[in-house]
Amino acid sequence: MNFRNCLLSFAAFGLVIALMAVPASAQTRVGEAAVVKNEVLRVAASSTTQIKVGDGLVRDEVVRTGRDSATRLVMADSTNLSLGPNATLKLDRTVFDDEHHYRDVAVRMTSGAFRFITGHSDKAAYKITTPLAAIGVRGTTLDILSQRGQTIVNLQDGAASVCTVTFECIQLTQPGDTAIITSGGGGRSTIKKTNNPPWTFAATCSAAAGLCSKTQYADATPVIVDDGSDPTGMLCGR
């Protein structure tokens, strides 16, 4: 093998090694933790890790709060998500339109108490679900309580559409309007509307300083978050 071919082979080998060094789990940052009180966990298939203020969030992330714990997450479009104690949330899907807006963002509120404040994205981009409800928003602040057998959706401002899994829907148009969905067994559920809400997130706001504040995303341009497995801290594509 002549010297030129040797150099080419070495360069190709180096490229393969460099590509292998980029962590496969590196993903686009879609938000960050703005408020963290006590146990706020990032839940993966085989492990859980504590989330700290300023930590980034990525797509398909599951966040869980413990007893006497709370957090507020700020998405890249400045959507604010507040979680009370013993809550579980999954960032199901996030598709960027540009660095300030989502084309599609899906959030699943599995259990617990939440406050959801929409950000800068088109309102049709937001898709919120619980085990019993699908919620569409229009410039909205919503309080959502997801419990076994029941979901309560309370409108603070804006407007929202709340549907059961069998597509029975009601519209929330006035502050205080509340949808209550109750499981009746056999995959069926009932939905009713009231303007005398049995619950709101307001009582949870005192759980942590700043929990019910609204802030803008500090860095609207999505960046890459790695899992710590790259010892150099350098990633391709930055």
Task: Give names to the regions the model predicted.
Residues 31-182:
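Structural recognition of beta-strand segments within beta-rich domains
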Residues 1-28, 48-52, 76, 84, ...:
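C-terminal interaction modules
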